Design a protein with these regions (language model features):
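Short alpha-helical packing/oligomerization segments
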Residues: 449-479
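Small-residue-rich segments of transmembrane alpha-helices in multi-pass membrane proteins
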Residues: 496-503
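Acyl-thioester-dependent acyl-group transfer interface
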Residues: 1-68, 77-103, 233-424
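Cytoplasmic-side transmembrane-helix entry/capping segments in multi-pass membrane proteins
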Residues: 488-496
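Membrane-associated alpha-helix detector
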Residues: 422-458
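Acyl activation and transfer enzymes in specialized metabolism, enriched
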Residues: 37-56, 114-130, 200-236, 384-386, ...
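Non-catalytic, low-complexity flexible loops and terminal extensions
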Residues: 2-13, 107, 119-127, 131-210, ...
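Juxtamembrane boundary at the C-terminal end of a transmembrane helix
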Residues: 504-514
Length: 514
């Protein structure tokens, strides 16, 4: 099928490190969902997804590993709707597995759109979900004569897959020489693998807007200040002199015209060093000032060019990915030292007035290795999605207490996610026991083979082959369980490695031809 899109394209600048830093503890997946006022019909949702994919074939891509960079390759794989069974933000990108980088699922009244961040950002995901919900409701209610979202006709396929980072990059823009301080790090026992603690809070847009206006700030500034103060009460004593710092993603389309559906975002870092005398007003004024200083086109261009300058460096481009990946991972880890948590405000979701009869609210939250808050609003309801690797929800409670103190009406949403919660964790513990038992058996078999070999022959000869077989079997199972990697590829690498070792052994021990 000819979609008019490129058969392959390189990852945009913001996505370059995502495949490398994706792991069992942070999947780099975010969930955008729509809560309807009626139960979702899976067959109609599949038909709606088929229609939506005709408008967004850009998303019909798999992630491949090249010699120098990762890239996206178009594949004619049908996106299939599934009932929700996995925990939120479960892993979508699995190395060596040629699968789509997003998943549409449903549960009761909820339509979920989960996407790996290398494919698109929050703005791209929002447009896709808007289109999907529109197509679903039009099919589900043909008699309602619901209007369709209007699209600018002049937007081309090339516009949607454009790498806007490269378009607006300029080597003449000066470098950002600002040094970042190490920020407060939240302490506590973390959940393992893709498990995370999810809390959602719905609040009145009118109330939060009234409060922000009375303070002379935007809603984003107000919520950022409240988030900083909520974390303040949980600062470990040995980190009291460090700043509490939030990463705030910035939609670069607001500063540089772009219709791209790929990632096109930057970020600013907003922080505060607390003392015993600090008041909420002090934090609010500081945050407002930092936003005004950072959200200037010239400074944003400086940050953006800094990201791209590294990618464009001839030496970096010439280094193979297998070597480059270690430096990218180190860079990502060093960058996270100046961040305590993340706050991402997607903004207002707009649909024609006729759709309000069927939609309750929209929500968004993301996988994290620490703490993240996301927000979006529809009508008079803003939903805050907190995700945390630390099951203690004291920061979330602090935030809700502050909302009450500021007379902002709110309520905690009691969502039930299939595959999430204590039952899911117990199942994982049982799986862990099975894996531990298998590991013990592999070791025990190898030891028993060694004992039998020594008792019968007085030396260890065939034991080495039995031990290698046990090690290979253990490695295959571990890769399949923990990394969900390609088992056949793993076997091929093992065969190649064993063959090389055997040849070298034969060569340097004088044994010929075995």
């Amino acid at each position: 099928m000819d979609t008019g899109y490129s058969k392959w394209r390189k990852l945009d600048n913001a996505a370059l490190a995502f495949p490398l830093v994706t792991g069992k503890n942070d999947t780099r997946v975010f969930r955008f969902y729509c809560q309807l006022k009626e139960e979702v019909n899976g067959e109609i949702l599949q038909a709606a997804l088929d229609q939506t994919m005709e408008k967004y074939p850009l998303f019909q891509a798999v992630l491949r590993k090249g010699l120098f960079w990762f890239y996206l390759e178009h594949r004619d794989i049908r996106a299939v709707v599934k009932p929700e069974t996995e925990p939120p933000c479960s892993r979508l990108y699995i190395p060596d597995k040629k699968s789509l980088l997003f998943q549409v699922s449903y549960d009761k009244n909820r339509i979920n759109f989960e996407v790996f961040h290398a494919l698109t950002d929050g703005t791209g995901a929002m447009h896709f979900l808007q289109e999907l919900v529109q197509d679903y409701l039009i099919l589900a209610h043909p008699q309602a004569d619901l209007p369709q979202i209007e699209h600018a006709e002049e937007i081309t396929h090339g516009d949607k897959e454009e790498d806007s980072f490269s378009q607006y990059y300029s080597s003449d823009i000066p470098k950002d020489k600002e040094k970042k301080k190490a920020a407060v790090k939240l302490k506590g026992e973390k959940l393992v693998h893709s498990d995370m603690h999810v809390t959602e809070v719905a609040l009145s847009v009118k109330d939060i807007h009234r409060k922000a206006r009375s303070c002379g700030v935007s809603i984003t500034v107000l919520l950022t200040a409240m988030m900083l103060c909520s974390i303040r009460e949980e600062i470990p004593k040995n980190q009291q002199k460090r700043p509490v710092a939030l990463m705030i993603p910035v939609n670069l389309r607001n500063y540089f015209p772009s219709q791209s559906m790929t990632n096109f975002f930057g970020w600013i870092e907003v922080g505060y060093i607390f003392s015993d005398e600090t008041t909420f007003e002090d934090v609010l004024l500081s945050v407002k000032k930092q936003f005004e200083e950072e959200l200037v086109k010239e400074k944003i261009a400086m940050h953006m060019s800094g990201y791209v300058r590294i990618e464009k460096n001839p030496f970096v481009r010439a280094v193979p990915l297998e070597i480059k990946k270690y430096f990218l991972m180190i860079g990502a880890n060093l960058g996270s030292r100046s961040i305590t948590a993340v706050y991402s405000n997607i903004g207002i979701i707009r649909l024609p007035e006729e759709y309000k009869e069927y939609i309750q609210h929209f929500g968004i939250f993301a996988s994290t290795n620490s703490l993240q808050m996301c927000s979006c609003s529809y009508g008079d309801e803003m939903v805050l999605g907190f995700t945390s690797k630390i099951p203690n929800d004291s920061i979330q409670r602090n935030f809700q207490r502050m909302l009450g103190e500021e007379n902002v009406s709110h309520r905690e949403l009691k969502n039930e996610f299939p595959g999430y919660g204590e039952k899911h964790r117990l199942e994982k513990k049982e799986n862990q026991k099975v894996i531990q038992t298998f590991s013990f058996l592999c070791l025990a078999i190898a030891v028993i083979c060694g004992m039998i070999n020594f008792m019968m022959a007085g030396v260890l000869n065939w034991f080495w082959f039995a031990g290698a077989g046990c090690a290979c079997a253990w490695l295959v199972v571990m890769v399949a369980y923990y990394k969900r990697g390609n088992i056949l590829k793993n076997e091929m690498w093992q065969l190649l490695l064993i063959s090389v070792i055997a040849i070298l052994w034969d060569r340097f021990t004088g044994w010929k031809g075995w």
